[in-house]
Amino acid sequence: MAWSRLMLAACLLVIPSEVAADCLSLCSLCAVRTQDGPHPINPLICSLECQDLVPPSEEWETCRGFWSFLTLTASGLHGKDDLENEVALEEGYTALTKLLEPLLKELEKGQLLTSVSEEKLRGLSSRFGNGRESELLGTDLMNDEAAQAGTLHFNEEDLRKQAKRYGGFLRKYPKRSSEMTGDEDRGQDGDQVGHEDLYKRYGGFLRRIRPKLKWDNQKRYGGFLRRQFKVVTRSQENPNTYSEDLDV
């Protein structure tokens, strides 16, 4: 970069300043306009070609075409002839086509690829349409049957694992829900029928503990204290004892 800048400065010192300024302005404008394109213009080479210090190449030609295209509106305002305007338009269009050629080629390649892929997909769909639907349905049915067989086998394996884990405990002592259903079906006297809610609520707790305590003719804590701690409540004492104490 430093060597190129020194060369540019030397060239500017040798040639007249007006021509150098014009070439630099034109090339800088072209470089700014084409910096986002696929082939940006190098302002140094363009200015050297403009000043005839380097043999002309594509840089200066494309820049000149751009400049003619950009100065078309200004030339129309100044009142130039239509022929000159047409020439400027043609030059600008040629420069644009030169710059846009690689982009157009890439777009055409992409369109060709998409068309080829669409044709391949159509061919595949036509092949599948000619007798492949029945095969697909058959494979689906086979997969469903295999899945059902796998679930049955899995359930059998689970039962075997449970039997091994509990040592046949489930076989000897079935679940309480099955016992309850059997009791309700067998019960004719009304003893076991209707207790399912209680068993669900307490989890069989009522069956395991001692029978229901009879609290007949007992007040709030009288029977409990008498049974557990052998405490006589005041309500069970003889009222005559209080009358004797008062008489004394």
UniProtKB/Swiss-Prot annotation:
One GO cellular component, as annotated: dendrite
Disulfide bond positions: none
Subcellular location: Secreted
Stretches with biased composition (Basic and acidic residues): 183-195
GO molecular-function term, one example from the UniProt record: opioid peptide activity
Signal peptide boundaries: 1-21
TM regions (residue ranges): none
Region of interest (Disordered), ranges: 174-195
Keywords of the record: Cleavage on pair of basic residues, Disulfide bond, Endorphin, Neuropeptide, Neurotransmitter, Opioid peptide, Secreted, Signal
Principal localisation: secreted
Propeptide residue range(s): 22-163, 177-199
Entry's Gene Ontology BP terms: chemical synaptic transmission; neuropeptide signaling pathway; response to immobilization stress; response to nicotine; sensory perception
Post-translational modification: The N-terminal domain contains 6 conserved cysteines thought to be involved in disulfide bonding and/or processing.
Role of this protein: Leu-enkephalins compete with and mimic the effects of opiate drugs. They play a role in a number of physiologic functions, including pain perception and responses to stress.
Family the entry assigns: Belongs to the opioid neuropeptide precursor family.
Protein name: Proenkephalin-B
